[in-house]
Amino acid sequence: MNRFLIIDGLNLVRRIHAAQPNENDVNGLPERVTSACRKLLSKHNPSHVTLVWDGDAISWRKKLYDDYKKGRKPMPEALSQALPALKQHLAERGFHSIDAIAEADDVIATLASKMVQAKGEAIIVSTDKGFTQLLSPQIQLWDHFNQQAITIEDRERQLGVDRSQFIDFLAMAGDSGNKIPGIPGIGPKSACELLKTFRTLANVYASLDKIGAKQAKKLEEGRALARLSYKLVQLQTDIPLNTRLANFRVELTAKA
């Protein structure tokens, strides 16, 4: 069975670089990143591998909601300037890349989904828990830095809801890390209780007459933000990709 190792490029590289005392010091970065990639190959033994990188264009999520991911620390300039040479270094060693137009997330989600459609498996390497909405027996999420899988069960315990409710939960409760607004006045506890009672966001809105007046008012006033938040959280799995799986087959140079 084919197994596709899909590495969230900047998620990996920025964390490796952050271990440096001086953010302007990129000496040895290509070797450290290559070493990490080879360890991932050894751990997961994939048939295919790629790194997916964020692009420079404004993402559709940012266009939809200007506060999306607002306030995040920008990439150090030295690291930004080092990326082209880093990608070339990796390619020469068998680790080829896909450059997203904007965010890498939807490209990663599309690659993983297409691999499953082709009766294969996908392992996403990232610490971004947004990918947990994709998890299934065929799609895994691996945290390289803690050397452990991020499982559906972990996320269920963290949020207090079932796997099928992850997106609905965040649409109501929001996600401060990504500046997803959610519904004002409906925090994680309320979102969890509502989903335990009504199962889905759609059912919540179909049952406002069964909810206390104060909370129902918050839900009604926040309906548009809930719809917006749902769109922001949900990963797209059908991004057009002008590439072939064969381009990412693991090469002997990557295993060396």
Swiss-Prot record:
Cofactor(s) the record lists: Mg(2+); K(+)
Kindly list the positions annotated as binding K(+).
172-173, 181, 183, 186
Residue positions annotated to bind Mg(2+) are 105
Top-rank taxon of the source lineage equals Bacteria
Protein keywords: DNA-binding, Endonuclease, Hydrolase, Magnesium, Metal-binding, Nuclease, Potassium
Chain intervals for the UniProt region annotation (Interaction with DNA): 185-190
Q: Give the matching InterPro entries.
A: 5-3_exonucl_a-hlix_arch_N, 5-3_exonuclease, 5-3_exonuclease_C_sf, DNA_polI_H3TH, FEN, HhH2, PIN-like_dom_sf, Xni
Q: According to the UniProt record, which cysteines are disulfide-bonded?
A: none
Q: One MF term from GO for this chain?
A: 5'-3' exonuclease activity
Q: Name one GO biological process term.
A: DNA replication, Okazaki fragment processing
Write down the EC number.
3.1.-.-
Note on how the cofactor is bound? Binds 2 Mg(2+) per subunit. Only one magnesium ion has a direct interaction with the protein, the other interactions are indirect.
Q: Where is the 5'-3' exonuclease domain?
A: 164-250
Enzyme class, broadest EC rank:
hydrolase
Function as written in the Swiss-Prot or TrEMBL entry: Has flap endonuclease activity. During DNA replication, flap endonucleases cleave the 5'-overhanging flap structure that is generated by displacement synthesis when DNA polymerase encounters the 5'-end of a downstream Okazaki fragment.
Check the record and name the HAMAP family matching this protein: Xni (MF_01192)
Family (UniProt): Belongs to the Xni family.
- What's this protein's name? Flap endonuclease Xni
**Organism annotation:** Shewanella loihica (strain ATCC BAA-1088 / PV-4)
